[in-house]
Amino acid sequence: SCSLVGSEMCIRDSIGGNGFAAILKNGGNKTVLFRADMDALPIKEETGISFESVKTTKQNGMDVPIMHACGHDIHMTSLIGTAEYFSKNKDSWKGTIVFILQPAEEIGFGARQMINAGLFKKIPYPDINLALHVSAQTQSGTVHITPGFAMANVDSVDVTFYGEGGHGAYPHLTKDPIVMSSQFITTVQTIISRNLSPINAGVVTVGSIHGGTKHNIIPNHVDLQITVRSYSDEDRELIISRIKKIAESIAIQNDLPKNLYPIVKLRDEYTPAVFNNPDLAMRAKEILSKELGKDKVFDGPQVMGGEDFGQFGRVEPKIPSLLFWIGAVSQKDYKEFLNNSKKLPSLHSSKFLPDYEKTIDTGISSSIALIEAHLCLLYTSPSPR
């Protein structure tokens, strides 16, 4: 943020912790919010480059290595480069640009904390929100745009099954929470296949099971951790409701007293879906096709990953928003990948190494083009979602 602090911008820092806003005003009546996330990941970098991360942080009282394994360094650099361009070329545009540097995206809290700390009372209210994200599976120099739902709602659910433990040789004298958990794990998969519309998408993944201590002991409880992914609010509510009902029905099937019914807890970690305003997405494709070339701009797929940028568009009144993907794979690596001779490191991999110069150039040029188009009225304001 030093590059922004030293400029003529109005600075708002420490918003919801380490959140940061820089406001660049230049007359006009249009306002664009451009956001980049900042946080790194607790991963030891293994890319072998000369500027490989050697930084550490404290996690649970221990020193752990960190690196930018999700491209947030590219995001920040693209934002700063975009800000420098608009600061130095004020004759070519009118309006207001709000540059947001957001912490804690990886844990899903950063955007919410900034909003709860009054972000939108500290800045001019935007007409549109923009953000970008690197892609570890597409070639540098390209852009991918997904109209409508682009990334998923993310929920974390904890379920504890209780029973009456005892000796493994005498299961008829117990109420076995391991068997109940097994019933639950298979049954919740029918939520997606039988309760959700086949046209829609969702995920219920049981990622953690903890129960029992020894071969011949039936435990008193089993703990499950579940990630739930969905797109619409209606599907999200349906999936969570069915998880609760299935857990309770299994308790009833096993003649458990009500004081031993399973506990289903929805963690306060909800990340809303990223919804790309369709009008904004369509116009962005047109603008970037002119800026980069039609052969560089593609329709992007919906993904079940989460991104808390969606929070910025859900404030009232709602703000049309767009998150677009920029390719980060070098031409050489991408060709080898297409020939099945190379596997590409994914985001969150210790070996993730973007083709940084070309990726940053694309991030900056794309962001400038989209912001200028809105401020200079090259297209009309998109209708609300």
Predicted regions and their residues:
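Single conserved hydrophobic/aromatic residue that forms the stacking wall/gate
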Residues: 1-6, 11, 379-385
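Histidine/acidic-residue-rich, glycine-tolerant segments that coordinate divalent metal ions
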Residues: 21, 41, 55-67, 73-74, ...
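Active-site beta-strand termini and strand-to-loop segments that position acidic
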Residues: 22-27, 315
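Catalytic-core environment of secreted peptidases
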Residues: 26-62
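Short, flexible, mixed-charge acidic loops at enzyme active sites
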Residues: 45-56, 148-152, 335-344
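Short pre-catalytic strand/loop immediately N-terminal to key active-site residues, enriched for Gly-Thr
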Residues: 61-70, 350-358
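DPxDG-like acidic metal-binding loop motif
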Residues: 76-82
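Metal-dependent amide/peptide-bond hydrolase catalytic core
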Residues: 179-381
